[in-house]
Amino acid sequence: MSSLREVPGKMFQLAENRQEAGRELRDCVVETLQELMKDDDKITALEADLGGASGFTKIKKTNPERFIQCGIAEANMMGVAAGLSLTGFKPFTHTFAPFATRRVFDQLFLSGAY
């Protein structure tokens, strides 16, 4: 029996009886980054003042030298990430989706691909 329910007049379905995975996605992301950082000293985490929401504060505690707090300046964070990647680092950036679009792509284009 399907756990999806059709919504009359809509192009989507609603999930019912959803089960929780027991872990939040941010915890999986942070744990994976921390594992990767053990084997690769070029991995760097950049944050846009969302440490509590992203879980990146854990990375700041375990790898403070590879954590960069960029503040509420997502476009600038992408410029920093582009510069890091051009010098051999592997930056991972975090921000909320609405702040990682439009102007941020201009910065990526100008700093990393132009």
Which residue stretches match the model-derived regions?
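Thiamine diphosphate
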Residues: 1-114
